[in-house]
Design a protein with these regions (language model features):
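Short, flexible loop segments at the rims of nucleotide/cofactor-binding pockets, characterized by
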Residues: 6-12, 85-86
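Active-site beta-strand/loop signature of hydrolases that rely on acidic residues for catalysis
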Residues: 3-8, 19-42, 97, 109, ...
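Structured beta-strand-rich core segments of catalytic domains in phosphoester-bond hydrolases
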Residues: 35-116
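Signature of WW domains and closely related Tyr/Trp-rich beta-sheet microdomains
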Residues: 14-17
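Sequence-level motif detector for i,i+2 pairs with an aromatic at +2
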Residues: 1-3, 69
Length: 117
């Protein structure tokens, strides 16, 4: 099993095709992307991952702020969101999922950006 974690920097922007090509070269079974966003480039990347077999996806995004950094986990196997008992106060900065792989496991991803006050 190959798991890749990658900070794609600012939602990927114009680099999403290069990011998708590099992920193709690595041939991961699961990808955890930080600084993923609800913007068109990031959404295009999610679609590209789905077309490459990473169709099971869970994201931690702020729909009210499309350009806010969040997280995406994409997998070849079904994902189940896990609700933590003591969740961080910033939900776009973490994502916890169960992976229904041949040997099931839990994956936690952290990323995003801190709230500025």
């Amino acid at each position: 099993m190959r798991v890749v974690g990658w900070n794609i920097r600012a939602g990927g922007g114009r680099r999403v095709e290069l990011i998708a090509a590099q992920l193709d070269a690595w041939a991961p079974d699961i990808v955890a992307l930080s600084e993923f966003r609800a913007t068109p480039p990031s959404q295009h990347l999610a679609e590209a991952l789905a077309a490459r077999g990473l169709a099971f996806q869970q994201a931690a995004l702020d729909p009210g702020q499309l350009s806010r950094n969040g997280l995406l986990v994409a997998s070849r196997w079904p994902l189940k969101p896990i609700r933590a008992r003591s969740a961080p106060s910033e939900p776009c900065r973490w994502l916890l999922v169960g992976v229904d792989a041949p040997a099931p496991f839990t994956l936690g991803a952290r990323g995003g950006e801190a709230t500025r006050e």
